Amino acid sequence: MELRKITTPRLTTACRFHGRPDGRKLLLIHGNASSSVFYEHIMERLEDKFCMAAPDLRCFGDSDALPVDATRGMRDFSDDIHELVEALGWDKFIIFGWSMGGGVAMQYAIDHSDKLDGMVLQSPLSPFGFGGTYGEDGKKLEPLGLGSGAGCANVQLIAALQSGDRAFIASVIDSIYVAPPFQIAP
């Protein structure tokens, strides 16, 4: 597993690379509240079949913490991905997107379908962002853009985030996001 930083005109992206250099190219896009680290286990299992890259999206992991224009849906992330694959010289590849990464992958497919050999989505959100949308033009389910995400939030976790209760936050991350024996320091 190799971690490199790739600088494009848009930003510097931290990216994990693994697999066969001559294998089919597979780009793995992580979800919200995660990073490319989440794909290390999968990359190890697929190392004999694919040439893989797993970038940290902007504001995540070790990539530049640049602002995101929410009015563009997933397009800031998708544009970053396009610059990255151009810098890597990838002409054709399979894109895999999980959660928010699925929305990024769909936006990439809308804008650059000619670059894709395939797309795999795992529990994706809309390419139009976090508000509830429908249809190919991203029409809002209701005028304020409500209808996804926060309605399912854990009230205790929100209170811990507001009060700075790092021990509770670490326990949530340990139980949901990471595998033993790894633990988040309180």
Name what the model sees in each region.
Residues 1-12:
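N-terminal cap/lid segment of alpha/beta-hydrolase-fold proteins
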Residues 11-70, 84:
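Conserved HGGG/HGGXW glycine-rich cap/lid loop of the alpha/beta-hydrolase fold
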Residues 140, 148-186:
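Alpha/beta-hydrolase
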